[in-house]
């Protein structure tokens, strides 16, 4: 009597080959996930390469990079604040309008001052005082948004949409549709405008330094402090 050997699938008879194939599939999946996570950065690199080829060395010139860094720093600072909101599952549509409002108020304070009609005097303020005042105004608007969402139960989208239009309306009323340009201030008050904030330090825009400091502070808050743990939770 001849016994026929059991027929096994080829993969069962070659476990080493099966493991190799599984490892390759796993590596391919990990590579694909990595590419998907970094797709924004990849697109950015491709755009830089494309415009470098099209425009030559002028695209990566010092003046161009400085201009880009100045604008990116502004949006980066806004993004840091939005990060905390988005992590908690919220959204804030009013952030751009709030920036426009406080910018308009700051321009008015530094160029025109605040006129007290009942006393017949006009008060002018130094740049540090104006900056602190605008930060307080921004915090108050943010607190109002938070109270509307948490205490009144209004959806963040609706609450911040309303705040966006209110801030935009106040900015238009304050400026009558005009802009504040050539903001020089008054030397006697040490108030020469926002030249320092708009200037460069060691060839790098001041806003980039501010953004870097705020980014480090944000990371420390999220990773090291109980408030950050609560936000991430």
Give residue ranges: language-model regions:
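Membrane-interfacial amphipathic/re-entrant helices at transmembrane-helix boundaries
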Residues: 17-79, 114-129
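Single transmembrane alpha-helix segments in multi-pass membrane proteins
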Residues: 48-52, 61-112, 140, 147-154
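Transmembrane helix-bundle core of multi-pass membrane transporters
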Residues: 156-225
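Alpha-helical transmembrane segments within multi-pass membrane transporters and channels
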Residues: 114-163
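Hydrophobic core segments of alpha-helical transmembrane domains in multi-pass membrane transport
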Residues: 40-53, 82-83, 135-138, 167-169, ...
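Hydrophobic alpha-helical transmembrane segments
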Residues: 38-45, 68, 75-76, 97-101, ...
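Short, Lys/Arg-enriched N-terminal segments with co-localized hydrophobic residues
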Residues: 1-20
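Short cytoplasmic-facing helical segments at TM-TM junctions of multi-pass membrane proteins
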Residues: 227-233
